[in-house]
A protein has these predicted regions:
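Nucleotide 5′-phosphate-binding alpha/beta core
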Residues: 1-98, 104-248
């Protein structure tokens, strides 16, 4: 079974879940809020705002003020620098995600196992499932076995507490390292380099992708990474063809 079929299966499950919850959004919102309050009532933040005594959306609005990232940053700093637990939630913190920093300092948020699973299924597998159903409906064909370059770096960087931090969009692929060779032309050493800041990947991404006749997709989180790669191809196609021909 192609590994893309596994992505389709996980995506189908997530799409069914989305369909179920969007049938009655307010009911889903109320259930989700109650679940969050129940699970995190014993965290420092939960005790501060009295999560244990909140039983409705209206009560939550009255007791919990509107907040910004600045309200949570001190908790995140304590987790990173002091390795403190049960601050914002009671689940086990597995790793961190960061924003791009395009509008200032990158915002770092801790992620639990449940968060990572949701990011995996909704952030990655749903798109594969949606593409598969679209191709089947419009062309009457199966989604081809997926193979192509992933133009991104998944290594991340370690923080003071030893846990790694990636951009949120990278996380779903971070945990697929053991199986990337089944759907990715980019070798693991290129996706998970030891010193990513020293590596320009354009040549290597193209060198491995152009030599593979089974390429069916181009993958990236940011489209400019793909356009940069194609700019490199336009300027250096003769060298790439020569290297492929000679087996360099």
């Amino acid at each position: 079974m192609p590994f893309s079929d596994l992505g389709i299966l996980l995506g189908d499950v997530s799409l069914l879940e989305i369909e179920h919850y969007t049938k009655d959004p307010m009911k889903a919102q109320n259930m989700t809020l109650r679940k969050i309050l129940r699970r995190n009532k014993n965290s420092e933040l939960g005790k501060k705002f009295g999560f244990a005594d909140i039983h409705s959306i209206d009560e939550y609005r009255k007791k919990v003020p509107l907040t910004t990232y600045a309200d949570y940053e001190p908790y995140v700093e304590r987790m990173i620098h002091n390795r403190e637990k049960n601050l914002m939630y009671t689940g086990r913190n597995v790793r961190y995600c960061s924003s791009s920093g395009s509008v200032g300092k990158p915002k770092i948020l801790p992620k639990s196992v449940k968060d990572l699973w949701n990011m995996q299924c909704i952030g990655f597998s749903c798109s594969v499932s949606t593409a598969a159903h679209y191709i089947k409906k419009t062309k009457g064909k199966r989604l081809p076995a997926q193979m192509g370059p992933l133009v991104l770096v998944l290594t991340g960087h370690p923080l003071e507490d030893g846990k790694r931090c990636n951009g949120a969009g990278q996380v779903p692929l971070t945990y697929l390292k053991p199986i990337t060779r089944f759907f990715c032309t980019s070798p693991a050493s290129l996706l998970y380099p030891e010193h990513e800041e020293l590596l320009d990947t354009s040549y290597l991404q193209l060198r491995f992708a152009l030599a593979n006749r089974n390429v069916s997709y181009l993958g990236s989180i940011v489209v400019t990474l793909l356009t940069t790669m194609f700019d490199y191809l336009e300027d250096n196609w003769e060298m790439l063809c020569d290297d492929i021909e000679k087996g360099i």
